[in-house]
Amino acid sequence: MTIRPLHDRVVVKRLEAEEKTASGIVLPGAAAEKPDMGEVIAVGAGKIGKDGARRPLDVKAGDKIIFGKYSGQTVKADGEELLVMREEDIFGIVEK
């Protein structure tokens, strides 16, 4: 199943969370925090402004992003947990 987001929404796959603390303590699955970084899988065509023009999104598929811990709606596709969120919920793009 493929999810094609509409308007200014993006589909994001969370990056794997660290399962060890900085001091080396291994965290059980429930204790590990959900990561607030992910990879953009798909983007919508953009939001339509008041003038009727479509504004393209600043993010694109493949971008690594930072978002709020409680951003987006969780969905399952092909056994994989993904997030669907608005572009405004994204704090920034991680550049190397």
Curated annotation (Swiss-Prot):
<protein>
    <recommendedName>
        <fullName>Co-chaperonin GroES</fullName>
    </recommendedName>
</protein>
<comment type="function">
    <text>Together with the chaperonin GroEL, plays an essential role in assisting protein folding. The GroEL-GroES system forms a nano-cage that allows encapsulation of the non-native substrate proteins and provides a physical environment optimized to promote and accelerate protein folding. GroES binds to the apical surface of the GroEL ring, thereby capping the opening of the GroEL channel.</text>
</comment>
<dbReference type="InterPro" id="IPR037124">
    <property type="entry name" value="Chaperonin_GroES_sf"/>
</dbReference>
<comment type="similarity">
    <text>Belongs to the GroES chaperonin family.</text>
</comment>
<dbReference type="GO" id="GO:0051082">
    <property type="term" value="F:unfolded protein binding"/>
</dbReference>
<comment type="subunit">
    <text>Heptamer of 7 subunits arranged in a ring. Interacts with the chaperonin GroEL.</text>
</comment>
<keyword id="KW-0963">Cytoplasm</keyword>
<dbReference type="InterPro" id="IPR020818">
    <property type="entry name" value="Chaperonin_GroES"/>
</dbReference>
<dbReference type="Pfam" id="PF00166">
    <property type="entry name" value="Cpn10"/>
</dbReference>
<keyword id="KW-0143">Chaperone</keyword>
<dbReference type="GO" id="GO:0044183">
    <property type="term" value="F:protein folding chaperone"/>
</dbReference>
<dbReference type="GO" id="GO:0051085">
    <property type="term" value="P:chaperone cofactor-dependent protein refolding"/>
</dbReference>
<dbReference type="GO" id="GO:0005737">
    <property type="term" value="C:cytoplasm"/>
</dbReference>
<dbReference type="InterPro" id="IPR018369">
    <property type="entry name" value="Chaprnonin_Cpn10_CS"/>
</dbReference>
<dbReference type="GO" id="GO:0046872">
    <property type="term" value="F:metal ion binding"/>
</dbReference>
<dbReference type="InterPro" id="IPR011032">
    <property type="entry name" value="GroES-like_sf"/>
</dbReference>
<dbReference type="GO" id="GO:0005524">
    <property type="term" value="F:ATP binding"/>
</dbReference>
<dbReference type="GO" id="GO:0051087">
    <property type="term" value="F:protein-folding chaperone binding"/>
</dbReference>
